[in-house]
């Protein structure tokens, strides 16, 4: 038989309208003999026929891979029917008479998994007896006596031992020459000679007995020799050994020799034990001396201490040597980067370099946490937070009182305006000398007076003060703009009182809008910054200075009163503990204590012209936090206890922290001035980045400039993916060449969540914590998907030279190169015409995968997703440790593992050529990423033409109303009842959907939808598009090239109706996009981006759950549950239904319902007739449930069987096969059986990618040398894993990855062991029914302030919208992942061996060797073997029938190896060691031929 159905057709191959037949025929071309029927709907049948009718035993395989085994008589079912589901160990038996079912029996035992072995070969005359072994019942198996079963077990054990042991193996001899000759005759043929296994077992037992006798003889000899004395020796007869008399001298000689031998052996053993004890002592010494290594002061470590730390981390010896040679101490650990590790230390592997950096990261996190714990006590800080909450309440009460006062003040201000006008005239005529004298008399330490213009920034150096020279004309313009203030010194209060008296006498200094106060802060002859403050009241200074103390923090001697500067408009309010600091070179702080809060400041009027962009303070931020903590002394801990973390980050070398609290009275006009800053003084003259927070939006601006943030509402820029976990707050820049990266932004997390401080000293020494990666550091870009073609028609074959010049179009049809080459992959692969799918079996197929392309620390990474809850952490850590120890050049490097319930992410290195399957067969495509700038560009484009669209919409709406009224009569109300939902709101939505659907149907052929411009655009071919290597494109190029293209497209589609819900450019409306876009980036502690960037959901296959009342409670969901955009993209035909009827691989929402009634042939019938049948099925199922519930009360339990009786159930259609699916479905619903469930994995929408598919010339066949190179790499890796006992390897063509130079590497080994540690019964955060109705767990999402979740099905991919209470939208990309409950039942594909297809298990390497043979055939023939569209066809053809591979274009020397690997008897398959020997000989032969050819070419012969 051939590889495909059409390329290599056998002789007896007949195609019909509904199925295809492969087998024997009569003279009348009727089915006669053994044959296979492959139905176009996905089912298959294997059995015997007589004159076109089914007779004898047969196996019917469903779409769900459930096997129905029974006997047929005249094309009718006779006797009992055995039902074997694929993913469960339960077996059902249906007994019936006269077309009436009498009873049903099921077995829960694992009898079918036990393999039966016979004396003769099972596969001799398989055509006649292929189904006897599989169709035997459990009752018949139990008839065998106990001795027969033991004999079979002995046979299986012997066969397994012969497969492993080379000495006893007669199939594979020692010599290679004998192996090649002998194996071709025996092991490479499926029909081998019979072996007398009884004789072999007898020989084996005799050998064992002989070995045991020899051992006993040796023991007796040793005892006799040692027991001999100087006296005469006597003869002893023990085990046929004769001892004669000997002399005393000989006896003494033998005694000495034996004693000396024992002494030598004892000494050797003692030395070995001493070495072991020394190693144990050293390990105990280092483990006990963990306390000697002070983690806090790791920067002061010597070389010895660094090596001691690495030894405790269980690092390889090569790393220790490289650290020792380069003399790396604790100071150098901070400056280590990837380049230094690879170039200087000599550790070239990128993965190993990252793991070293992860160890250093853990050490620094532990050091920071210890230092932080010493400085701050958490209990006292909780009291601080409580006080802060009380102040917030008091402030709210104070605001209401202020409003009443404002109204009274406004009346008084109008009366005083006349008086103030007179005072302003006097103030304008005042000279500058009064102010200059007032300053110069009272400030002694000013050495240089610097004057600046109004457009320059103000900055201070040591022993200098800065103030602005101003003219009288300039003062008039600036009086109402700024507040400025000076700090004042406590030691010079007397001199300031004189200034206050001088100002009180001169009333002309008063301004119309308020008073100016001047405060000078002097300390040890050094003047600090000058900050000007303007008060809001016209009262005297004594009244203003009284309410200075604010309840922000507990009173401390370091607190000094001051006024709030107006120069920093982004200053934080009093409720926030974070300071608003603006960068400027600062002067050295004062060591003298500040004044008491009761002492009032001295007011002094002053004039200033202060630019908006300028700001000055005495703050500067050090690049790292660790230097500050080391310099701080223990005496300052009492001052620091009650301060927030951001205040501590600005700590001084002298550790004298001074807080300036703002006054409690504010200006009436400006709301920005209501925010109180917390300002610190520091001693350094370097520039520092601005660090300003607000209550609504936390700004984090990293700019080495002197400008402060302009507005409170300005957009804050920060990275979405965090680079530190919740336990770590500060990590230096290990992974970049920069050394001054500032990450103090995340320190606030530890303070807000005080209990999350992870104080475990083992963190610094544990390597596994470096291997386990936080999920926040992972970025998911897109799933790795492979699409390939069915070679059913030679016209559509990729390898055909006629199709090489053609390119795929949007509808998967071939066109010339002039057309576009972009394809929307995630749409339905199959065309809307069902007849084409029936004839072609579906042109394109998709490989299911759980792999994603992502990024980790800026490096491209492949991420595999596993679903489940971890049962045993100890086993999982052991498995991960064993995987880490596996080191081979042909194994894919595992970067790490991250755990985020309910997912387990395994991170691999990314290979650019992807897997071998995609390199050979799949369609080549590129990914283009477009940034958010292009989104805004499209919104602006949309807004400009929105007016034109509205005009066309108004015209179209009038025309569509009449058209919809006509179509309403043709709508069947059964479509609504089909969803099992009785709410009136939902019914109305379904009717409206049918109206819109009929309107849009006519326009699909003429025009394209603009609804999905955001996710997919058909760009012209001339545009320069970056490949998968470059993850970003130049937006300017795309903008220039595609601007004209987009305008044309919008003009063509003017007549399309735009809805707020369906358009991708707007979630609610275009006006609200900018608000939702900005709000995503404003929130600092964003739960959706940081803590929950990965969500989880599960599809519930039961339709009964849709009618639950919990779905609609508390108005969590919209009334419009079935929006128009939910179904508009998935429905292409009237034959498709929302409840996921298995209809030619077209499913709504990609949900696979295992227990639906598949006996309905919806293809051949109309929609009305199908709906009637579905309603009948539901009624019938409800009746059977009632009967079964009655019968459950009368269960009869028999000794060793689970026996269940039922009432007689009448069969509606006795002659159509299978007639018992309704009855089986009723049992399955009552019994909780393990079954597949789909999980909706959702990740953040970081990029918009377009899938551009182009067929390249890489589909040509690989050369023989490249094939041999790939095969040798695979065999080397498999032999290494076989020695390490990592079974099963899970070898597949999709798990073989290729480099740029086509070096093969194996992945996914050991994942089956990890899955055994997982529990698939998960408490999902939300569930999705078949109607895409979402059910949320309230407790979890109410805490997160999530309002609702909605799925929007798009052409490109399904998006999940998550709404806040503020109606902010967060978009998530989604992917459907199958959750398998039993790992022993793998997915079926063309590489699965026949024993697994028949329902058995393989715990050894047998299945991997079978897959190896198919991979070799696949590479040599450049074709897919057993390329059938359905898994049931593969199960029937490969599992039960004897379809063989064709070896037309494959060399003869390799054919024998492939036949051995693909042998149906798994015990006759070779091991990987034997495969290596054969490949080495073949590789040498191939090289000799090439060398001979070269020599002959050079010689000219």
UniProtKB/Swiss-Prot annotation:
<dbReference type="InterPro" id="IPR011009">
    <property type="entry name" value="Kinase-like_dom_sf"/>
</dbReference>
<feature type="glycosylation site" description="N-linked (GlcNAc...) asparagine">
    <location>
        <position position="811"/>
    </location>
</feature>
<feature type="glycosylation site" description="N-linked (GlcNAc...) asparagine">
    <location>
        <position position="737"/>
    </location>
</feature>
<feature type="compositionally biased region" description="Low complexity">
    <location>
        <begin position="543"/>
        <end position="597"/>
    </location>
</feature>
<comment type="subunit">
    <text>Interacts (via RVxF motif 1 and/or 2) with phosphatase PP1C. May interact (via SAM domain) with SERA5 (via C-terminus).</text>
</comment>
<feature type="glycosylation site" description="N-linked (GlcNAc...) asparagine">
    <location>
        <position position="133"/>
    </location>
</feature>
<feature type="glycosylation site" description="N-linked (GlcNAc...) asparagine">
    <location>
        <position position="258"/>
    </location>
</feature>
<feature type="glycosylation site" description="N-linked (GlcNAc...) asparagine">
    <location>
        <position position="506"/>
    </location>
</feature>
<feature type="coiled-coil region">
    <location>
        <begin position="399"/>
        <end position="433"/>
    </location>
</feature>
<keyword id="KW-0547">Nucleotide-binding</keyword>
<feature type="short sequence motif" description="RVxF motif 1">
    <location>
        <begin position="483"/>
        <end position="486"/>
    </location>
</feature>
<feature type="region of interest" description="Disordered">
    <location>
        <begin position="392"/>
        <end position="425"/>
    </location>
</feature>
<dbReference type="InterPro" id="IPR001660">
    <property type="entry name" value="SAM"/>
</dbReference>
<feature type="glycosylation site" description="N-linked (GlcNAc...) asparagine">
    <location>
        <position position="1157"/>
    </location>
</feature>
<protein>
    <recommendedName>
        <fullName>Inactive protein tyrosine kinase pTKL</fullName>
    </recommendedName>
</protein>
<feature type="region of interest" description="Disordered">
    <location>
        <begin position="204"/>
        <end position="223"/>
    </location>
</feature>
<feature type="glycosylation site" description="N-linked (GlcNAc...) asparagine">
    <location>
        <position position="1382"/>
    </location>
</feature>
<feature type="region of interest" description="Disordered">
    <location>
        <begin position="543"/>
        <end position="607"/>
    </location>
</feature>
<dbReference type="Pfam" id="PF07647">
    <property type="entry name" value="SAM_2"/>
</dbReference>
<keyword id="KW-1035">Host cytoplasm</keyword>
<feature type="glycosylation site" description="N-linked (GlcNAc...) asparagine">
    <location>
        <position position="471"/>
    </location>
</feature>
<feature type="compositionally biased region" description="Basic and acidic residues">
    <location>
        <begin position="257"/>
        <end position="273"/>
    </location>
</feature>
<feature type="glycosylation site" description="N-linked (GlcNAc...) asparagine">
    <location>
        <position position="1074"/>
    </location>
</feature>
<keyword id="KW-0067">ATP-binding</keyword>
<keyword id="KW-0325">Glycoprotein</keyword>
<feature type="glycosylation site" description="N-linked (GlcNAc...) asparagine">
    <location>
        <position position="448"/>
    </location>
</feature>
<feature type="glycosylation site" description="N-linked (GlcNAc...) asparagine">
    <location>
        <position position="1024"/>
    </location>
</feature>
<dbReference type="GO" id="GO:0005524">
    <property type="term" value="F:ATP binding"/>
</dbReference>
<dbReference type="GO" id="GO:0007165">
    <property type="term" value="P:signal transduction"/>
</dbReference>
<feature type="glycosylation site" description="N-linked (GlcNAc...) asparagine">
    <location>
        <position position="239"/>
    </location>
</feature>
<feature type="glycosylation site" description="N-linked (GlcNAc...) asparagine">
    <location>
        <position position="128"/>
    </location>
</feature>
<dbReference type="InterPro" id="IPR051681">
    <property type="entry name" value="Ser/Thr_Kinases-Pseudokinases"/>
</dbReference>
<feature type="binding site">
    <location>
        <begin position="836"/>
        <end position="844"/>
    </location>
    <ligand>
        <name>ATP</name>
    </ligand>
</feature>
<dbReference type="InterPro" id="IPR000719">
    <property type="entry name" value="Prot_kinase_dom"/>
</dbReference>
<keyword id="KW-1032">Host cell membrane</keyword>
<feature type="glycosylation site" description="N-linked (GlcNAc...) asparagine">
    <location>
        <position position="463"/>
    </location>
</feature>
<keyword id="KW-0175">Coiled coil</keyword>
<dbReference type="InterPro" id="IPR001245">
    <property type="entry name" value="Ser-Thr/Tyr_kinase_cat_dom"/>
</dbReference>
<feature type="short sequence motif" description="RVxF motif 2">
    <location>
        <begin position="1238"/>
        <end position="1241"/>
    </location>
</feature>
<dbReference type="InterPro" id="IPR013761">
    <property type="entry name" value="SAM/pointed_sf"/>
</dbReference>
<keyword id="KW-1037">Host cytoskeleton</keyword>
<feature type="glycosylation site" description="N-linked (GlcNAc...) asparagine">
    <location>
        <position position="819"/>
    </location>
</feature>
């Amino acid at each position: 038989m051939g590889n495909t159905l059409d390329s290599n057709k056998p002789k007896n191959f007949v195609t019909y309208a509904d199925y295809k037949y492969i087998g024997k025929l009569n003279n009348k071309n009727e089915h006669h003999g053994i044959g296979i029927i492959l139905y176009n709907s996905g089912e298959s049948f294997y059995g015997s026929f007589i004159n076109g009718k089914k007779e004898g035993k047969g196996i019917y395989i469903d779409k769900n891979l459930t096997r129905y085994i029974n006997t047929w008589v005249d094309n009718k079912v006779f006797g009992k029917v055995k039902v074997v589901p694929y993913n469960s160990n339960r077996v059902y038996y249906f007994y019936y008479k006269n077309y009436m079912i009498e009873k049903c029996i099921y077995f829960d035992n694992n009898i079918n998994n036990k393999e039966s072995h016979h004396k003769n070969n099972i596969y001799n005359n398989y055509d006649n007896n292929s189904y006897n072994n599989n169709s035997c019942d459990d009752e018949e198996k139990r008839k065998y006596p106990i001795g027969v079963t033991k004999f079979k077990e002995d046979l299986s054990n012997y066969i397994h031992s012969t497969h492993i042991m080379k000495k006893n193996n007669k199939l594979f001899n020692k010599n290679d020459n004998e192996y090649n000759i002998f194996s071709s005759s025996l092991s490479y043929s499926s029909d081998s000679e019979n072996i007398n296994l009884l004789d072999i077992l007898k020989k084996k037992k005799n050998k064992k007995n002989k070995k045991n006798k020899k051992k006993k003889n040796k023991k007796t000899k040793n005892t006799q020799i040692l027991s001999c004395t100087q006296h005469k020796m006597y003869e002893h007869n023990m085990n046929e050994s004769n001892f004669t008399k000997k002399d005393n001298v000989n006896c003494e000689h033998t005694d000495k020799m034996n004693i000396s031998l024992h002494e030598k052996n004892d000494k050797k053993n003692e030395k070995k034990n001493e070495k072991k004890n020394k190693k144990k002592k050293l390990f105990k010494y280092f483990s006990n001396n963990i306390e000697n290594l002070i983690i806090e002061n790791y920067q002061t470590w010597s070389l010895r201490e660094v090596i001691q730390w690495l030894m405790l981390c269980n690092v390889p010896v090569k790393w220790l040597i490289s650290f020792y040679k380069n003399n790396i101490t604790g100071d150098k650990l901070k400056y280590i980067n990837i380049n230094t590790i690879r170039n200087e230390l000599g550790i070239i592997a990128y993965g190993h370099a990252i793991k070293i950096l992860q160890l250093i990261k853990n050490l620094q996190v532990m050091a920071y946490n210890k230092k932080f714990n010493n400085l701050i006590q958490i209990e006292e800080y909780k009291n601080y937070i409580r006080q802060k909450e009380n102040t917030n309440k008091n402030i709210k009460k104070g605001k209401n009182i202020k409003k009443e006062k404002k109204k009274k003040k406004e009346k008084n201000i109008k009366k005083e305006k006349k008086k103030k006008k007179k005072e302003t005239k006097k103030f304008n005529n005042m000279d500058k000398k009064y102010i200059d004298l007032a300053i110069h008399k009272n400030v002694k330490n000013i050495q240089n007076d610097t004057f600046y213009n109004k457009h320059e920034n103000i900055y201070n150096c040591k022993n200098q003060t800065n103030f602005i020279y101003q003219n009288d004309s300039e003062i008039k313009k600036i009086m109402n703009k700024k507040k400025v203030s000076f700090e004042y010194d406590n030691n010079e209060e007397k001199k300031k009182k004189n200034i206050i008296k001088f100002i009180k006498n001169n009333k002309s200094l008063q301004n119309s809008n308020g008073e100016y106060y001047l405060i000078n802060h002097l300390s040890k002859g050094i003047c600090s910054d000058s900050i000007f403050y303007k008060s809001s009241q016209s009262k005297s200074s004594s009244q203003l200075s009284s309410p200075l103390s604010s309840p922000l923090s507990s009173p401390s001697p370091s607190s000094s009163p001051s006024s709030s500067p107006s120069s920093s408009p982004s200053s934080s309010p009093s409720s926030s503990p974070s300071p608003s600091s603006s960068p400027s070179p600062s002067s050295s702080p004062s060591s003298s204590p500040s004044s008491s809060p009761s002492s009032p400041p001295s007011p002094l009027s002053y004039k200033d012209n202060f630019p908006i962009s300028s700001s000055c303070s005495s703050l500067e931020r050090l690049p790292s936090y660790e230097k500050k903590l080391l310099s701080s002394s223990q005496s300052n801990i009492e001052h620091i206890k009650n301060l927030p973390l951001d205040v501590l980050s600005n700590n001084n070398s002298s550790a004298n922290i001074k807080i300036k609290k703002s006054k409690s009275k504010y200006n009436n006009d400006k709301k920005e001035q209501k925010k109180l800053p917390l300002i610190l003084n520091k001693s350094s003259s370097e520039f520092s980045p601005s660090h300003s927070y607000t209550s609504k939006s936390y700004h984090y601006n990293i700019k080495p400039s002197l400008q402060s943030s302009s507005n409170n509402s300005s957009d804050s820029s920060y990275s979405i993916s965090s680079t530190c976990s919740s336990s770590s707050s500060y990590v230096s820049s290990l992974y970049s060449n920069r050394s001054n990266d500032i990450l103090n932004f995340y320190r606030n997390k530890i303070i807000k969540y005080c209990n999350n401080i992870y104080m475990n000293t083992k963190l610094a020494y544990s390597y596994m914590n470096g291997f386990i990666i936080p999920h926040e550091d992972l970025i998911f870009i897109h799933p790795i998907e492979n699409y390939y073609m069915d070679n059913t028609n030679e016209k559509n074959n990729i390898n055909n030279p006629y199709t090489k010049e053609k390119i795929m179009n949007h509808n998967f049809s071939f066109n010339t190169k002039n057309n576009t080459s972009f394809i929307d992959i995630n749409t339905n692969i199959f065309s809307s015409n069902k007849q084409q799918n029936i004839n072609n079996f579906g042109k394109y197929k998709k490989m299911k995968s759980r792999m994603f392309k992502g990024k980790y620390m800026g490096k491209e990474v492949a991420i595999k997703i596993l679903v489940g809850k971890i049962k045993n952490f100890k086993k999982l850590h052991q498995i991960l440790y064993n995987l880490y120890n596996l080191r081979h050049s042909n194994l894919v490097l595992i970067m790490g593992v991250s755990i985020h319930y309910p997912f387990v992410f395994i991170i691999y290195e990314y290979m650019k050529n992807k897997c071998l399957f995609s390199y050979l067969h799949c369609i080549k495509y590129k990914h283009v990423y477009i940034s958010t700038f292009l989104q805004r560009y499209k919104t602006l484009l949309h807004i400009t033409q929105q007016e034109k669209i509205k005009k066309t919409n108004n015209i179209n709406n009038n025309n569509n109303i009449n058209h919809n009224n006509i179509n309403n009569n043709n709508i069947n109300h059964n479509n609504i009842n089909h969803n099992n939902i009785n709410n009136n709101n939902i019914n109305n939505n379904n009717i409206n959907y049918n109206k819109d659907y009929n309107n849009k149907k006519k326009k699909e052929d003429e025009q394209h939808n603009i609804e999905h411009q955001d996710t997919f655009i058909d760009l012209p071919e001339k545009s320069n598009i970056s490949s998968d290597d470059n993850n970003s494109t130049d937006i300017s190029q795309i903008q220039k090239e595609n601007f004209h293209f987009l305008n044309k497209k919008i003009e063509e589609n003017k007549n399309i109706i735009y809805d707020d819900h369906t358009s991708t450019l707007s979630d609610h409306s275009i006006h609200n996009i900018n608000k939702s876009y900005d709000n995503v980036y404003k929130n600092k502690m964003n739960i959706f981006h940081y803590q929950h960037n990965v969500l989880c959901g599960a599809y519930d296959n039961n339709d009964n759950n849709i009618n639950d009342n919990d779905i609609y409670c508390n108005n969590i969901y919209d009334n419009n549950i079935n929006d128009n955009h939910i179904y508009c993209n998935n429905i292409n035909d009237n034959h498709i239904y929302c409840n996921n009827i298995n209809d030619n691989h077209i499913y709504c929402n990609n949900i696979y319902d295992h227990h639906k009634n598949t006996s309905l042939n919806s293809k051949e019938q109309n929609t009305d007739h199908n709906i009637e049948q579905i309603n009948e099925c539901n009624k019938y199922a409800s009746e059977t449930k009632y009967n079964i519930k009655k019968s459950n009360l009368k269960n009869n339990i028999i000794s060793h069987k689970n026996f269940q009786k039922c009432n007689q159930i009448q069969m509606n259609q006795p002659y159509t096969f299978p007639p018992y699916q309704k009855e089986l479905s009723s049992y399955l619903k009552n019994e909780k059986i393990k079954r597949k469930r789909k999980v909706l994995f959702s990740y953040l929408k970081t990029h918009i990618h377009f899938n551009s598919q182009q067929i390249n010339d890489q589909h040509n066949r690989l050369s023989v040398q490249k094939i041999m190179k790939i095969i040798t790499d695979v065999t080397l890796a498999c032999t290494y894993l076989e020695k390490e006992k990592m079974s099963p390897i899970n070898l597949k063509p999709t798990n073989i990855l290729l480099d740029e130079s086509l070096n093969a590497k194996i992945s996914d080994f050991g994942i089956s062991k990890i899955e055994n540690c997982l529990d698939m019964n998960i408490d999902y955060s939300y569930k999705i029914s078949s109607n895409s109705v979402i059910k949320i767990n309230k407790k979890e999402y109410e805490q997160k302030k999530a309002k609702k979740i909605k799925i929007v099905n798009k052409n490109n991919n399904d998006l999940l919208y998550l709404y806040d209470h503020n109606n902010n939208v967060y978009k998530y990309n989604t992917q459907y992942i199958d959750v398998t409950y039993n790992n022993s039942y793998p997915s079926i594909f063309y590489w699965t061996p026949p024993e697994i297809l028949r329902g058995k298990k393989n715990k050894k390497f047998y299945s991997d060797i079978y897959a190896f043979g198919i991979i070799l055939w696949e590479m040599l023939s450049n074709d897919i073997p057993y390329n059938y569209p359905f898994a049931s066809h593969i199960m029937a053809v490969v599992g039960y029938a004897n379809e063989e591979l064709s070896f037309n274009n494959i060399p003869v020397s390799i054919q024998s190896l492939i036949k051995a690997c693909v042998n149906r008897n798994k015990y006759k398959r070779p091991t990987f060691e034997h495969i290596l020997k054969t490949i080495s000989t073949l590789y040498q032969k191939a090289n000799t031929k090439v060398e001979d050819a070269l020599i002959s070419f050079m010689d000219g012969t």
